[in-house]
Structures are given as C-alpha cells and as structure tokens.
Amino acid sequence: MYLYTNGTRLFFDVVGSRLKPLETVMQPKPTLLVLHGGPGLDHSYFRPSLDPLGDDAQVLYLDLRGQGRSARHGKEYYQVGIMADDVAAFCAEVGIEKPIVLGHSFGGYVALTMAMRSPDLLGGLILVSTAPVERGYDLDALEQLAGKNLREIAARQQTGTASEEDMQRFNTEVLPLYWYQFKPEYLSGIFGKTVVNVKSIVSRALLAKLSHLLANQPVRTLSPASVNSAESENSHLP
C-alpha cells in the first residue's frame, strides 16, 4: 500500500487488525511500527520473525523514503531528520496514536530522532543494533575477525569512498559475523526478498556521518499530509 505524505510517497504494509475480541467486547491492540535498517534495504527481512506478532499487535512495516518501494528523491532529501518527519507525518495521516516504534540499525537513528523531537508521539521505543556513539568500526578488531582486505573496505566505507563492489563484498563476508551460529539461508532471506536500492541513497558518506546528522538536523515543520485520491481507499488501516 502507498501513502502520500510530507512531500513523498511511502510504501507500507500491515499485519493484524487494530482490535481483538475479549469476551463480549473488542479490545484495542498496541501498534508496532517497524523501521528497517540500511540505508538501501526495505522492510521485508523482518516479516518472518515479526509477522506472528500480528495476533497480539497491529504490525506496520514502513519503507523509508528512497528505499524499498518508496519514492526516490534527490540526495538533498536523504537526511535522517527528514525521514523522521516522514514517519511522524505517516503516523498522523493514518491515525496511529502512541505506536511502539522499533528501529533497526539505520532505522534506529530515524526512530531516535523522532523520539527526541516529539517524545509524546511514541508509546515506546525499541532500538536494535543502533550504535549510541559517534565513531565507526573498530578497524583493528574487524581485521582480526575478517582480515586486512575487509578492514580496508570498512575504512573506505567510513570515508564515503566505498564502491558498489566493496559494499557487496563487505555485506556477504561481514554480516555472517553478526550471528552466533550463522546459516547461509539467513543472508538469502535478507537479500533474496529485500528490494535493495543503495544507489538511490545519498553517498556512503551518510553512513559515516549518521551521528553528525542526528545532532545537527534542524527541527522542521511538518507539511500537511495528503493521500492520493486514487489510492486512498487502500491506504487506510483496517
């Protein structure tokens, strides 16, 4: 489903309804809003693990602007603060009150920015693998785990000079280190279903500057959200 808001078109999907039966009445369920990692991925890698929560919560998956199935823009619009505004406008448009926002990795920066600017909008905040410090990889430790070549790629990534080939090799060789007991199907589950669009995102310098962007983004006033009339019937939640 698509929704037009804050000057962009966002793709989202929903698992579970807002209400569940409790004896003779319908009881509201909490809303879990999931923000994927990246930049350059989409929400789909979360589906196998989080869809079962639809029995007890309404789970909303959102593709951040420029990623997955959401609309592409110029590089100047790929900023953490703007994406946080997108999420806040999305919640207002579809009528979500006090969602529990789960942000994974890069999505955690977006969720944290939203929480810092408008804490009253959130019912809860879950950060998954979102770094709390302003530094990049421990290159010495990475070299011990993955070798000198991967250390050099990580160094280029942090300065914004990594190539597409660098990123592909880094992802396939370093991501397995995140699992205690890695299985190859874990990566196929991510990259086999995810709509990857790294080139549409601002240069790799964004990866090296997340903390700087977080600290220095000015607060922006949300523009009124509008739903495209041709798709509005499919945009509202059940």
For each feature predicted by the language model, list its residue ranges.
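Conserved HGGG/HGGXW glycine-rich cap/lid loop of the alpha/beta-hydrolase fold
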Residues: 6-76, 90
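Active-site acidic short loop of glycosyltransferases
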Residues: 7, 29, 92-98, 119, ...
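Catalytic nucleophile-loop/oxyanion-hole region of alpha/beta-hydrolase
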Residues: 71-84, 131
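Conserved acidic catalytic loop of the alpha/beta-hydrolase fold
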Residues: 81-99
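Conserved hydrolase catalytic core segment
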Residues: 97-140
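Flexible "cap/lid" loop of the alpha/beta hydrolase fold
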Residues: 123-158, 194
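Alpha/beta-hydrolase
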Residues: 155-221
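Conserved loop-alpha-helix segment in the C-terminal half of the alpha/beta-hydrolase fold
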Residues: 213-238
